[in-house]
Amino acid sequence: MEEDFFKLILITDRQNIPMEEYLDFVSACVQSGVTAVQLREKGLSHRELLSFGGALKSILDPLDIPLIVSDSVSVCLDLDASGVHLGQTDGDVIEARELLGPDKIIGWNVHTLDQLLNANTLPIDYLGLSALFATENKPEATDLWGFSGLEQAVSLCEHPIVAVGGIDESNAGNVVEAGAAGIAAIGAFHSAHNPGLATKALREIVDRGLRC
């Protein structure tokens, strides 16, 4: 697993897509430049998450691409996933680190500056800054970070920042140039007519921005 696994994260949103079709989609994205996959399926049971996660791991493990589980330490442990991405209401980060050990990835979502500052002392690997811009997947998000908020967050944060929310080819370069270590997205992948080509283009944009 590369240290910069958070460079380009695909967040899942399978909905009613048949499993084999969705796995083909994920495979195309991974082969074209996605550096990690985040399993985020709010409506699934623990058992269903294990089934879906196991199918994803069959694609990701041979390529050494990490699978990060949203919200659930127990699913992460049962899957032996690479890590977990926790929100503010998903439990205690210190307890999660004790359960997962030192080698699992822990991402921590923040929505406010106070949450970001509090995260500086937490045993996490990266911080998810959400939401950066308006997005259909989180219509309830009103306090958006924007570019100015991102730049302030980068100057104050002790952890790598992964920007989340409303990021696509039109703004991804500016996001990483502003200091984000990576981006995570749903729509930029799922709404693409050709997911493989869209991923390749997005990865090239991110790589250029990180070199600036």
Swiss-Prot record:
One GO term of the biological process aspect: thiamine diphosphate biosynthetic process
Binding sites annotated in the UniProt record for 4-amino-2-methyl-5-(diphosphooxymethyl)pyrimidine: 38-42, 138
Binding-site residues for 2-[(2R,5Z)-2-carboxy-4-methylthiazol-5(2H)-ylidene]ethyl phosphate, renumbered to this chain: 166
Residues involved in Mg(2+) binding: 71, 90
Organism superkingdom: Bacteria
Listed EC numbers: 2.5.1.3
Catalyzed chemical reaction(s): 2-[(2R,5Z)-2-carboxy-4-methylthiazol-5(2H)-ylidene]ethyl phosphate + 4-amino-2-methyl-5-(diphosphooxymethyl)pyrimidine + 2 H(+) = thiamine phosphate + CO2 + diphosphate; 2-(2-carboxy-4-methylthiazol-5-yl)ethyl phosphate + 4-amino-2-methyl-5-(diphosphooxymethyl)pyrimidine + 2 H(+) = thiamine phosphate + CO2 + diphosphate; 4-methyl-5-(2-phosphooxyethyl)-thiazole + 4-amino-2-methyl-5-(diphosphooxymethyl)pyrimidine + H(+) = thiamine phosphate + diphosphate
Cofactor: Mg(2+)
Protein's name in the database: Thiamine-phosphate synthase
Organism expressing this protein natively: Chlamydia caviae (strain ATCC VR-813 / DSM 19441 / 03DC25 / GPIC)
Gene it is expressed from: thiE
